[in-house]
Amino acid sequence: MNAHEVNFDGLVGPTHNYGGLSYGNVASQSNSQAVSNPKEAAKQGLAKMKALMEMGFKQGVLAPQARPDTAALRSLGFSGSDEEVIRRAAKEAMPLLAACSSASSMWTANAATVSPSADTADGRVHFTAANLNCKFHRSIEHPTTSRVLAAMFNDERHFAHHAALPAVSQFGDEGAANHTRFCKDYGDAGVEFFVFGRSAFDSRFPAPQRYPARQTLEACQAVARLHGLSEAGVVYAQQNPAVIDQGVFHNDVISVGNGEVLFHHEDAFLDTEKVLAELHDKLGRRGGRFRAICVPRDQVAVEDAVKSYLFNSQLLSKADGSMLLVVPEECRNNPRVWNYLDQLTGDDGPIREVKVFDLKQSMQNGGGPACLRLRVALQERELAAVNPGVIMSAGLYDTLVAWVDRHYRDRLSETDLADPQLLLECRTALDELTQILKLGSVYSFQLD
């Protein structure tokens, strides 16, 4: 049965700024208060989408959130008109305004966890929006995320949508950034790989000491139950707490998987041999041949992996059966990482090609190629049922670039967030975007 993996990339929102909001994310914190360029950021993301589409990969787009989020500010006690709410927040609690203005929804790997129909009990594609409860600025995303996903995948014969898990630390869920799937072919039953940082209820599991573990085992298990996954098709693994403390805040900063291949750092997991053996066994029972490519720490240190985002890459299957690794420019700028990649593609392994993209605006906030996309494996009939307005084409690319040129600023500092005009600019832009993408009314300001 013919099936495809479609990458739905997050469109960078008009309020893209460097607020330094993400404790545990080294790049985010180190670039705090820098001046951003939302127009450039959006165009860098669109250029990646267009390039992959032109290479023959299925590509979609996921709309950004409406920011500043005045409803969130009202819930924190700011009152008056929207303009008055923003002015008061800027005067009394600038960190809250910065949080409610974040464009972090661009990193759609955190939008949701997705299980394809070949894996689920009812034969539908399942989506669970991530609660992202570890960070306030991201915890306010999931209601809009759910509405946007429902507008994109709106045929309930093929798609099932679940609300985010309870917004408490015991069920901290960061979505697909801690989830990947292995399979022989995208339409075959596969093995879903959930990676957690700690257990909420079992003290036998170790935990990081410096930075928080954002994903719990219990959240992973809950999502697997919601999606109707069988035990034979699920593997749970704990991320190494030591690498979380080195800035590996999601598993997609230290490993990436696709098809039958896991590309990972030597220090990515606890009990690595046991984890790999279980993946090999379970994928083998489903007709696949699991293969792990381990990057030794003496060739690429964890620090280099974090700085370059080597593993926050896209691993894509080409038509000839080989794989392409999509990496950020920072990998080419790191001699140790680039030497490793040169060696990797020269070997007789599955990864034969590396493609480099300039994603500096996103990277400075701590998000590489993998952060920017949500993978959805779809059968032909399911792909035909997706809202066609969100599938990338040459025409849509041109339309979105023109839309960005009309509505986005090329400079945004923290003080600019206090400008009530920014709110009006963003709402005007997003109101137009929902028409371009044929989403209907998905934003709170459209529903009020």
From Swiss-Prot:
It comes from the Bacteria. GO terms for biological process: arginine catabolic process; arginine catabolic process to glutamate; arginine catabolic process to succinate. The active site is at residues 174, 250, 371. Its EC number is 3.5.3.23. It catalyses: N(2)-succinyl-L-arginine + 2 H2O + 2 H(+) = N(2)-succinyl-L-ornithine + 2 NH4(+) + CO2. Pathway: Amino-acid degradation; L-arginine degradation via AST pathway; L-glutamate and succinate from L-arginine: step 2/5. The keyword Repeat does not apply. One of its GO terms (molecular function) is N-succinylarginine dihydrolase activity. Keywords: Arginine metabolism, Hydrolase. Gene3D superfamilies: Succinylarginine dihydrolase. SUPFAM superfamilies: Pentein. It holds the Pfam family AstB. The keyword Hydrolase applies. Homodimer. Belongs to the succinylarginine dihydrolase family. Catalyzes the hydrolysis of N(2)-succinylarginine into N(2)-succinylornithine, ammonia and CO(2). This is N-succinylarginine dihydrolase. It comes from Pseudomonas aeruginosa (strain ATCC 15692 / DSM 22644 / CIP 104116 / JCM 14847 / LMG 12228 / 1C / PRS 101 / PAO1). The lineage of its organism: Bacteria, Pseudomonadati, Pseudomonadota, Gammaproteobacteria, Pseudomonadales.
